[in-house]
UniProtKB/Swiss-Prot annotation:
The keyword rRNA processing does not apply. The gene is trpB. HAMAP family: Trp_synth_beta (MF_00133). Its EC number is 4.2.1.20. It comes from Xylella fastidiosa (strain M12). This is Tryptophan synthase beta chain.
């Protein structure tokens, strides 16, 4: 990691959409115009009090915000050490943080006069959230999803269809999130006149990384205020899972300038970094270009993107949002790899001690929160973003454990 001094983390990205040496717009010429149109529309909307009021009203009345911070007392006692606090994004409408972003982008799509939205999805939560807001606003919705992910997330596939969306299986490459994003990009280029592409993570070409971050930043703003109100101080440490990194940057952003708060991103180490079967782009990747932005990617010596693995479909992605790459290089956020078996153990322990089924993605963060707690005193506070609920993963976990459901 390079030696970077940053006075204000909220000053990024710059006017060209760069977070230090990461980000930007590495796209075909045919997409430059649509991206400029989108950036102009977003910049106008985010300064429009009426748009902000409509967004905030939907967060309150439709999503059900604010989400609470829950003190996992029995889990904390079982683990030993610090107190583990959970930011309960799993309690949102549709069951994850994803709807914070899709509400904002769908309102922007309607403002721009678009009649059709498309989305990519891995675990299916972003697809469900996109289909949900499309139904509410009367927009056509098409969701691209890797065939591998369709097999392991059939409940969410059916949920999308119930909401009126068309789910398009993607069989190219590893048939996972990366490939779904590729197909969605191709669709957007072809139908840009009436189509709005709702990217689900803080990746892609500018303005997507900053736009998705801004729509998810409500998580961190709420958490900061809740910590001060309920505990009289900020947490000592916090963690969130990182695939593309939308839930993580949503939590982290409000705390980036608070030097007293240690921040950790939990990437998917899969079967272990040494095996090569993982999706830990920062821990084990290198700088490169993927899906329109410069960031950390998992690739070979020739820059070719490699296949990834994670028990969690939502973390099974060979890149990461460019702001995370920048935060890693600056040293502000530390990124660690959590193996499948560690995430599964955390899933079960949280279920047994607190009666909460966490998404497998979120379980990576819970696993690291437990590790952090063990090394801290009893009065320390560790905040963990519980980004989604685990109903969607029950079949996957049962199959791994030889249980027929």
């Amino acid at each position: 990691m390079s030696d970077i001094t940053v006075a204000n983390y909220h000053a990024f990205p710059d006017a060209r959409g760069h977070f230090g040496r990461y980000g930007g717009r590495f796209v075909a010429e045919t997409l430059i115009g649509p991206l400029q149109e989108l950036a102009q529309a977003y910049d106008a909307a985010r300064h429009d009090p009426d748009f902000i009021a409509a967004y905030n009203k939907d967060l309150k009345d439709y999503v059900g915000r604010p989400s609470p911070i829950y003190h996992a007392e029995r889990l904390s006692r079982k683990v030993g050490g610090a107190q583990i606090l959970l930011k309960r994004e799993d309690l949102n409408h549709t069951g994850a943080h994803k709807i914070n972003n899709t509400i904002g982008q769908a309102l922007l799509a309607a403002r721009m006069g678009k009649t059709r939205i498309i989305a990519e999805t891995g675990a299916g939560q972003h697809g469900v959230a996109s289909a949900t807001v499309a139904a509410r606003l009367g927009l056509e919705c098409v969701v691209y999803m890797g065939a591998t992910d369709i097999e392991r997330q059939q409940i969410n596939v059916y949920r999308m269809k119930l909401l009126g969306a068309t789910v398009v299986p993607v069989t190219s490459g590893s048939a996972t999130l990366k490939d779904a994003l590729n197909e969605a990009m191709r669709d957007w280029v072809t139908h840009v006149g009436h189509t709005f592409y709702i990217i689900g993570t803080v990746a892609g070409p500018d303005p997507y990384p900053r736009m998705v971050r801004d729509f998810n930043a409500i998580v961190g703003r709420e958490a900061r205020a809740q910590m001060i109100e309920d505990y009289g101080r900020l947490p000592d440490a916090m963690t969130a899972c990182v695939g593309g990194g939308s839930n993580a940057i949503g939590l982290f952003h409000a705390f980036l300038n608070d030097a007293s708060v240690r921040i950790y991103g939990a990437e998917a180490a899969g079967d272990g970094i040494a095996t090569g079967r993982h999706a830990a782009s920062i821990v084990a990747g290198r700088p490169g270009v993927l899906h329109g932005n410069r960031t950390y990617v998992i690739c070979d010596d020739d820059g070719q993107i490699l296949e990834t693995h994670s028990v969690s479909a939502g973390l099974d992605y060979p890149g990461v949002g460019p702001e995370h790459a920048f935060l890693a290089d600056s040293g502000r956020v530390q990124y660690v790899g959590i193996r499948d078996e560690e995430a599964l153990a955390a899933f079960h322990l949280l279920a047994h001690t607190e009666g909460i089924l966490a998404a497998l993605e979120s379980s990576h963060a819970v696993a690291h929160a437990m590790t952090l707690a063990r090394d801290l005193p009893k009065d320390a506070l560790v905040l963990c973003n519980l980004s989604g609920r685990g109903d969607k993963d029950v079949h996957t976990i049962a199959a791994r454990e030889g249980v027929r459901v």
